[in-house]
């Protein structure tokens, strides 16, 4: 069974993904993030068709502690955050957390 990408965030953040063909998205206006972002993320987490959730790194600050812990420890779907200066190190940590090994580990021999 193939799984889909879901994007959660502001209209500005989700629009590009929608134009690229992502069909699952939860749009939350910036002014409503504190009230609505938790529910949008829970919806994506609970969707069996979703394998990856994409969010802007800065949006993690708007999540309640419980939802943030749920999404950060979720194996499937896996959270990928973009922006906010996370860089390659942030992606490396996300991959390591998701699959349990460091694919980018340098061989010390």
Curated annotation (Swiss-Prot):
GO terms for cellular component: plasma membrane. Has multiple subunits with at least A(3), B(3), C, D, E, F, H, I and proteolipid K(x). This is A-type ATP synthase subunit F. It comes from Haloquadratum walsbyi (strain DSM 16790 / HBSQ001). Belongs to the V-ATPase F subunit family. Component of the A-type ATP synthase that produces ATP from ADP in the presence of a proton gradient across the membrane. Keywords: ATP synthesis, Cell membrane, Hydrogen ion transport, Ion transport, Membrane, Transport. It is found in: Cell membrane. The gene is atpF. It comes from the Archaea. One of its GO terms (molecular function) is proton-transporting ATPase activity, rotational mechanism. The keyword Transport applies. It is a peripheral membrane protein. The keyword Ion transport applies.
């Amino acid at each position: 069974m193939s799984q889909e990408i879901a994007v959660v965030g502001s209209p500005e953040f989700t629009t590009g993904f929608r134009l690229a063909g992502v069909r699952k998205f939860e749009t939350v206006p910036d002014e409503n993030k504190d009230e609505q972002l938790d529910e949008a993320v829970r919806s994506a987490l609970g969707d069996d068709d979703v394998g990856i959730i994409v969010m802007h790194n800065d949006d993690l600050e708007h999540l309640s502690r419980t939802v943030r812990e749920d999404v950060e420890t979720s194996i499937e779907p896996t959270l990928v955050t973009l922006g906010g200066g996370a860089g390659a190190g942030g992606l490396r940590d996300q991959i390591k957390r998701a699959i349990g090994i460091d694919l980018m580990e340098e061989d010390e021999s």
